[in-house]
Structures are given as structure tokens and as C-alpha cells.
Amino acid sequence: MNKIKNTKKIISDSFNQKINFYNNDKYLGLNVNKSEIYSIIKFLKDNEHLLFNQLIDITAIDYPSRDLRFDIIYILISLTLNQRIILKSPVNENDNLDSITLIHKSANWYERECYDLFGIKFINHPDLRRIMTDYNFEGHPLRKDFPLTGHTEVRFDEQEKKVVYEPVKLSQEFRNFDYSSPWKGLENQLIGDEKAKKED
């Protein structure tokens, strides 16, 4: 039995509820319910046959048209098995997730980053505040409905000797860009050219 199949069997045997697996040759993926994230990650770390004891990342993907707007993603590695596992769970933008900082201390900053950039909240987090944007920043910049220009401009005012927030002032009107290239005679395709129709 290969390593991925063995890992899948250990997880299936240990959890009564049905877990939806997906995998390729390089890693095993689990689609899990948000209420099971904490217990599954704890199991993956503590089980002597798995030892997924290194948290690599926590991130999210925004799907604004879905009811469950975000997929929250946890990536773990077992150095013992030389194996990667990815947990994915769909969550609503108003859902509160259990913090896994008691299992993996490195989750602290990852969860803060998800909160700051996507607005996903984690309960029982020791210090859930913004980590990448300013404390007075409006909105969450990795949400797909966040305006490209932002809501405010931030600058340091030399006269007032403090940071000043002002409405965004654009030197030209906002433009939407299409990545298909209007240029003729280019040998190599530019990024986005694959969607432009080729002329005969």
C-alpha cells in the first residue's frame, strides 16, 4: 500500500463521519466541515503513524457568488512520512472558526493574516488583530469585491507629524483593462492573449 493510501485509511478508520478525499501523486486533500477542522488537525499531529506536526500555511480563496463564500485551506507536512496534506473547508463570511493556535503555535500569524486580508474570524485566538494592513484600514484587500484603488489614501503629513487618511484621489478616471493584446506582429503571446481571437 502506498503512503497516501495508508494515510487515507488511517484517517477514514479514525473518523466515523464520511470525509471527502481528493488527491494526486504529490499530496492528499481532505474536504472537511468547519466544525471538524480543529479535531482533524489535532488528530493529524498527534497520531503516531501520521505526525503531521508542521503547519505550512493557512489561507483562503474568495468565491463571492457562492453562499459559502470562502474556502479556508490548511497545509500540513509530516516530515516523518515525507508527505503533505491539505484540508479545505467552505465557510460563510460571518462564520467564526476555531483557532488552532493551541495545536500549532505558528497558526497565530497565519490566522491573523486571514482575518486581516479576508475578514475570517477565529475564536479563542490569543491576539486577533490586523497584521499586514494599518489598524484603521477599511475592508479586507484580498476579497474580490474590494476596490482596486482601496477606500482611502494613507500618507504621513510632515506638518502635522502624523499619518493622515484621505479619500482616494485618482489623477485619471478609473479604467477597466482587458489583457488581450491589441498589438500586431508580436511573435510571442503576452499573458492573456490566449483569449484573443487569432486573425487568419
Predicted regions and their residues:
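Terminal low-complexity/charged segments
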Residues: 1-200
